[in-house]
């Protein structure tokens, strides 16, 4: 479990776009794309990366089942940069694009890029050596 508690608003990266969920929201079910979940309570915002999954919204609860999620404050930048480099190195060797190994490495690269983007965009006082270029 990454987060549990009462909040004022949850912003999710839904398949059809970013969506803000307030208390007493109408029920819905949505898939999640790679992106950021923002949880705000009393003007304090926590941000999490999410690498796909689903969200179920009920009037008084939001449940997220994610393939991967983490609080941006817990991201180890060095580790994310190393994972990104390893994935790029493997992909550069020319794995066939239709293999499970290729898809797994591609997903690892996307997760690393997401972590590094989260740090750049949202974490205060942290600099990454990642340039954002592929």
Show which residues each predicted segment covers:
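Generic hydrophobic/packing signal
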Residues: 12-16, 24, 33-35, 49, ...
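A positional/architectural concept
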Residues: 1-47
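Residue-level detector of solvent-exposed, low-hydrophobicity positions
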Residues: 10, 29-32, 55, 109, ...
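Aromatic-enriched hydrophobic runs in primary sequence
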Residues: 6, 19-22, 57, 83, ...
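Acidic/glycine-rich phosphate/pyrophosphate-binding loops and surrounding catalytic core
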Residues: 71-134
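Negatively charged, Asp/Glu-rich surface segments that serve as flexible interaction/assembly modules
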Residues: 38, 44-52, 57-90
């Amino acid at each position: 479990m990454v987060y549990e508690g009462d909040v004022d608003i949850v912003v999710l990266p839904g398949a059809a776009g970013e969506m803000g969920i307030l208390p007493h929201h109408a029920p819905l079910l949505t898939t999640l794309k790679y992106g950021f979940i923002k949880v705000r309570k009393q003007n304090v915002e926590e941000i999490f990366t999410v690498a796909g999954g689903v969200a179920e919204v009920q009037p008084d609860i939001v449940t997220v089942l994610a393939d991967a999620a983490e609080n941006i404050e817990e991201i180890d930048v060095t580790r994310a940069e190393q994972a990104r480099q390893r994935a790029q190195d493997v992909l550069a060797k020319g794995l066939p694009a239709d293999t499970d190994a290729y898809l797994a490495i591609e997903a690892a690269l996307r997760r690393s890029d997401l972590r590094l983007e989260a740090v750049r965009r949202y974490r205060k006082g942290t600099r990454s050596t990642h340039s954002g270029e592929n």
